[in-house]
């Protein structure tokens, strides 16, 4: 009988020099790749300020005070990805509203017809009412059932969907049957 050679685990030749070089390289990559705590906090704080500015401007522009913060955050991120100077446009719009003491969006709209910030105002209003920021066929939807255009008639009009009783209809309890039908 012949002995079959053992094909055990592959031997790894690791010398002290290789171990030291590998450890040093790993520590260097970890130190360079990790962001500092201060910079992360600054980004979060500035993002919080821009979300607050966007939500306040949105409340003024739409006339709705109880806007969904999650939808607002998603819309803001989408606008900022589309236009890199969007945050400065928001600040400029808020300063314009404060400086001229506009009471409602209709007065602001009438005064800003030829202003370069007018399209930004219209885009914000349109995004909250339609739930999208683009006109394309495959545009990303940020708000569907919570889009503002469905809110005034949500008790009588079913939101367009393939689900016959509206989105998430299966979540609520079905209506109880008081009298059983007779066949």
From Swiss-Prot:
Signal sequence extent: 1-45
Entry keyword annotation includes Cell membrane: yes
Post-translational modification comment from the UniProt entry: Predicted to be exported by the Tat system. The position of the signal peptide cleavage has not been experimentally proven.
Example GO biological process: fructose metabolic process
Keyword hit for ATP-binding: no
Cellular location(s): Cell membrane
A single GO cellular-component term on record: plasma membrane
Bilayer-spanning residue ranges: none
Family membership: Belongs to the FAD containing D-sorbitol dehydrogenase family.
Function in brief: Subunit of fructose dehydrogenase, an enzyme that catalyzes the oxidation of D-fructose to produce 5-keto-D-fructose.
Subunit record text: Heterotrimer composed of FdhL, FdhS and FdhC.
Name of the protein this chain belongs to: Fructose dehydrogenase small subunit
Gene expressing this chain: fdhS
């Amino acid at each position: 009988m012949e002995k079959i050679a053992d094909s055990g685990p592959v031997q790894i030749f690791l010398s002290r020099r290789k171990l030291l070089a590998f450890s040093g390289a790993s520590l260097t990559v970890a130190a360079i790749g990790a962001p500092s705590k201060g910079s992360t906090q600054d980004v979060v704080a500035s993002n919080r300020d821009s979300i607050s500015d966007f939500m306040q401007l949105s409340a003024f522009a739409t006339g709705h005070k109880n806007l969904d913060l999650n939808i607002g955050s998603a819309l803001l991120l989408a606008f900022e990805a589309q236009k890199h100077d969007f945050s400065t446009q928001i600040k400029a719009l808020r300063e314009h509203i404060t400086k001229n003491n506009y009471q409602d969006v209709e007065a602001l709209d009438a005064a800003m017809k030829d202003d370069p910030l007018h399209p930004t105002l219209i885009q914000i209003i349109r995004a909250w009412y339609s739930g999208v920021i683009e006109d394309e066929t495959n545009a990303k939807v940020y708000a569907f059932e919570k889009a503002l255009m469905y809110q005034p008639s949500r008790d009588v009009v079913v939101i367009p969907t393939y689900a016959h009783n509206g989105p998430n209809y299966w979540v609520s309890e079905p209506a109880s049957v008081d009298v059983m039908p007779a066949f």
